[in-house]
């Protein structure tokens, strides 16, 4: 760990789990084509296929069961060399080797039992990751006595804009630019402002009891942990509880409190493609529109990447310090999951909600908009126009009205 941390600036750029899956799929396709073309190359083709396919023999059951992540008891020297190469490849990119992914039943049993743990999602689907986070929060039991069941969840999302539950999306994002840059739009289950994610950003979620919850607590811990390992980072906390570096925001937070429990989830900009973020949070609406809304408005801030830490290094450091700091009885285990194996009906239902137009466009706060040069005032609730100076507009979807505003005005 210390060697890795002392060489942050030299570490390779993050390569996501999904990229590795794509690489595996490519090699499978190429080797199948080669085998069909000429069987005499079968052995060499199989070797390259295996180089990018973790063997089931090398996979541990679960980290907390104490089995080795790497098994060298192979009868073939070639297989030993290939397995060693695979391990070196994984370690070089800080992905880890042969992480055992929990099944749906394992996930349910672990989440619903008492105890502390870390979960890292290997999925980059924002719909799955937000649904997983929601599942862990809702199903974490309240501790009736003794230590609380605090948990830590990590996930990395592919390109997306995530607005708060109580935000008016029309004032927060440019839908056309999101679409042109292949960013998904999500409305999360918690409050707060709008944030942008990509594979260079890590999302973390700290869950604890309502009694022990304090909005700035976990970010203070992260600042302490990272600054102690590399003082050159100079991380600090602003008055809103956001983590900043040299006056630039590198982490934004949101919170949820329900059922005697609470969570603080936040972003951490490490190697994000900030050029792609440009303009996405600047709605391109006509200047003649004047808005009134009771919803939460995002606070615009200058942002930057931390730059000298990769996503996997950040996850490793914070996980290790969490394990040491919150250890009570026995070690705090780390578990892994994805949207293919670690999924159940409750997570699927949450994903369906997050993906639905009803949740994205037809929820959120009431608002009104005045089109000044037309003398027109429109009032909207749940995405529908319910009051207007013109009766022919009442009952229309506001989304459709805005997309065809020239024809209506």
UniProtKB/Swiss-Prot annotation:
Secretion signal span: none
GO cellular component, one term: mitochondrion
EC number: 6.3.1.20
Lineage of the species this protein comes from: Eukaryota, Fungi, Dikarya, Ascomycota, Saccharomycotina
Protein name per the record: Putative lipoate-protein ligase A
Binding site for ATP: 188, 193-196, 249
Protein species of origin: Saccharomyces cerevisiae (strain YJM789) (Baker's yeast)
Gene3D superfamilies: Bira Bifunctional Protein, Domain 2
PROSITE patterns: BPL_LPL_CATALYTIC
